[in-house]
Amino acid sequence: MSLHKVSDTSLTSPSTSESKQAKLYVVKEAKGLPELKEKKSMVNHLKPLPPLQNDYRIPEEVLLSLNYAANAGPCPESLLPVKKPKAPKCALPRLVDHVWQHPIRRDKFKYLIDHPVSLTGAGRDISFLYDVKYVKGEAVEKKLCPPNKSTQSQSSAMVPHKEKTLADTLVPEEFHIVSNTGVSGLECYDDKYTTLLTDSENRLLLFPSMKPNKRVEVVQLSNVMDTMLERAGIENENYVGPTKMHQLLNVLKREQSIYNTVFHELIRQVSVDCADRGELLSKIREKYVQMLDHIAQQMIEFYKDLVTQRMMDQRILQELYNFKNVIEELTRELCLVQAHDRKLTKEAEKVQKNLAEALLEAEKNAKIVEDYHDLYTMQRGRMESDIKLLMTERDIWSSATYELALKVIERNRVILAKKLYLSEKGWNKYAKHFIIMLSTKDTGDLGMVEKLTEKWKKLVNKFKQDVERTEESTKEKSEIVKAGIIKWQEFFNNNLGKDVIIPSKRSPFAVALNDFKEYEKMLEEEKEKFTGDFLLSRYDALKVIKRLQENWTDIGFGILSRHKSMDGLLPPEHEYMEDIVKIISKLYREYEIRINGDNGISKVLPNLVISLDMCVFKLENFLDYSQVPTEEWLEIDEKINEMKFHLEALLNIIDSVPEGMDMEPGAALLEHICEMIQQWLLKLGNEITNGQIELLRHMDEMHIAMIQWMVNLLTIMLPDFTDQDILPKREESSLETPEEHEIGIAELEINAIALVKRLARYSSYLHSCCIGMVRAMALSRAAHLQKNPAKDRQDLERMNRECYDWISTCSHLISDIKGRKIRLLSYEEAEKLLGEEEASKLYFDPEKPPIDDDTDDEIDFKKPKFQEKEAPLPAAAEAEAIEATEAAGAATAEATGAAETATAEATGPATAEAAGAAGAATAEATEAAGAATAEATGAAGAKVTTEQGPSPSTNEKTIRYIKKDENIHCKPLFEEGIFFSWREPPSQGVMEPKYLEIMNVIEHMQRKLTEMDTRARKAEERFDEVNEQLHHSLIRNRNLERELEELVKTTMMGSQVKTENAKENQEDRGGKDDDEHQQTQTPPTSAKKEAQPTNSSEAPEDQNTPEPKPN
């Protein structure tokens, strides 16, 4: 088949007949094909060529074969045309050759349509070997879309491809290979009037032209191929890929595309002339493609190995780089370690050197220490021997001093010094005992407070958690109710006036009713938590907490009350404790408000329950409706809005208190309280320790001061004494002058006043600290039935009594030295120390006249004590005084013993009068003895000084008595001539009024003593008479009792005998014997009744008329 020549006009415009046929074909195809839009060239080498000469123009068939794939449009779902087709530029659609209309003949040229030209470059080249693009130096995966999409017109009729990306896998990115879509063969199908050709994307294509070709077309095709190869080479020179392989593949791709296009056209041209040659060329082409595929597979494997090796090299290089960095870092650290090691080595050498020097020094010092130790041991032995010698000398001198002191005390009659020492020793012992007891009690109470506070904290935390749990439950349920009612409100508002259907095919009103009932039940349960038994249990728990808190606060206040200052002020911890109690009361108030709902919960919850109840009632009426009633729903909607407001208020007031109350949140307040309690316990422990130390320090100071004052007193009281026969006479300048003696006495008095004030104040303070503790201990011991429960309280009173005795003794000593009465302690201080009753009894003793009223003492005080020397009492006077004292004591004891004997024996019906008489006799005897003793003491009160006075005669009667200084003094028993024997008459001196007053008192006392003696003798006589009467009455009673017992025994014996006789004769005598038996029983009973009045009548006679005493 030869190719027909085509004129120049035929290349641009078809002939007249062909144009008519083309128009008819366009009209036919207008209904089945969409309008083809103009498209730009898909590849750079398909751009329009520059204008050539007429001999070198591209034939029409070549242009159509090159452009039909690019200008192919999508295949519609229906063959109906949507738009009028538009003829492509530079060529008109041509009619399908007849050879393609017959299936048998079409099969011979099937190889022309099995391998269509692909614009994607897939299936005919090796472009799939590199599908990873490099954009700005970074690898980007190539998307599955046609190449050069950016150059494609946005108005193209081609079907757009959906962009796809690879999913993330475990395979590294550098191993991802993405291939282009392959190209499948074209398919033909017969239409009613023509045959259509489609590709794999359902695009309509033109059949290859079977028009005979000419040699010119072959030459032109060759020129076009050369031009395209030349242009492809120029473009490849401008292309720069990431690697040489990419550049090679780009060249192969472009050249293969050109070869594929030209080869396809050659096969078509050959097939026109000879179908067999075309088929052979097609087979050769297939083999060529298979060969390229085989090469491609080999290149793929090579590429994989290459990429793998490159990645391995890259990883190895990275590891080498990292290894190099690690080596550098390790080398750097090694250098630092070596430098540090060198430094340490130098320091170690230096330390070793210093250590060696220190060892040498230590050895030297050890030798020196050994020498010193030996020296110390020797010196200690000598010192111990010296100390033993000194202690022995001290003991000897102490015993000698003690014996001398006793002799001096007996000689100078300073018995009060011994009493002063014993009082001080007793006071010191009791004070130390109570200080230790106070410290022990405080320590035990502090431990108890710590335990109780810990227990209180645990209970409060547990109570707080319960309250918070309840409030959290109320809050959660309130939120559930709020969300539920809002949900139903929105549901019914959206379906107002409509038929309401829910997926469960149940009535929405029934579901809403169940929900509202559930809401009502939930709120009802929450309301019960603020009333009834639940609230009472909460109050009970809070009461337990309050009681526990009151226990440890009471113990704390008790500890602080025992640690007042000397001025009676409480420690600052007491005020701190009061602040804690106030804050705790605020905490209790807050919890009370929260558990009983006074913050508003107790008002809101009932309103919510009532509103829900009304809604439930309304919803029950909705069950018969299929639509939401408008009027009834408006009422429910109004109630729901009201409930929403109440629920919002409820959520805001939970876990809060009213705004009017100034309170902190419960958790913060409790934490603050715990911190305050911890600080208070620390302060309380410090206060107890410091208080004990202060008490012991003050006691030691008082002890030393009292001992020092007693030593100073003895030094001043003992006068200077020299003996001409034994000791040389001291110089006058070394003797103590009267002025120095008076100054010493004044200093002693001043020190005594200050010391007494301190001692009384300290004793009162210690007594006030311990009295509450001692009382509590006494009550506890009494409750446990222990022996002597009030022993500690008695010891505490003894401590104050010892203190007062010391002060009183000190007052007597100072008064004796000063020559006038001196009171070191006022009545108010004594009352504070001993109490009102005891102070009145001791301060104003009615039995002993005050020192101011003692005439003889006043006479003695007018002269200095160191110039007075009392003459020794004669032995006869001492004996008489002792006998008088013993006689008075014996008389008193005899009278008292007789009275007690009479009282003990006065028992029975006849002892009342005798007991009364005995009591009167006892009283009279005691009064007489007391008067006699008082007279003797009063008579002894007039002490006569021994200053150069005449000694009493041996025949004169004297009496011994104990004066206030506890020394034994003697004075004449009868003092009528006491002033006339050796002193001037009282009428001539200033003592006359005093003397007359004393004499009147003595005469009055003598008369009173005589009267008391008479009454005592009468009482003794009467006592004897009453005793005899009592004795006879007792004997008479015993006789009568004995007679009565004998009479009862005889009566009982007779009744038993007669009873036995009656039993034996009962059958014969019958009822008559019973009467006789009753008559025989009557005499003993009547005799017994007669005996009783006789005894009763005789008893008064015995009581009133005493019988003579039997001999």
Curated annotation (Swiss-Prot):
Record's compositionally biased regions (Basic and acidic residues): 1060-1078
Identification of the protein by name: Axonemal dynein light chain domain-containing protein 1
Domain of life: Eukaryota
Origin species: Mus musculus
GO BP, one annotated term: spermatogenesis
Tissue localization of expression: Highly expressed in testes. Mainly expressed in the round and late spermatids. Expression is detected also in the brain, lungs, spleen, and intestine.
Annotated InterPro entries: Axonemal_dynein_LC_domain, Axonemal_dynein_light_chain
Keywords: Coiled coil, Cytoplasm, Differentiation, Spermatogenesis
Originating gene: Axdnd1
Coiled-coil segments on the chain, per record: 314-368
Subcellular location: Cytoplasm
Gene ablation phenotype (knockout): Mutant mice are viable and show no abnormalities. However, Axdnd1-deficient males are sterile with reduced testis size caused by increased germ cell apoptosis. Testicular late spermatids are deformed with abnormal manchette structure, thereby causing male infertility.
Pfam families: Ax_dynein_light
Residue span of region Disordered: 887-919, 1050-1111
Biased composition (Polar residues): 1092-1111
Biological role stated in the UniProt entry: Essential for spermiogenesis and male fertility probably by regulating the manchette dynamics, spermatid head shaping and sperm flagellum assembly.
One Gene Ontology cellular component: cytoplasm
Keyword Cytoplasm carried by entry: yes
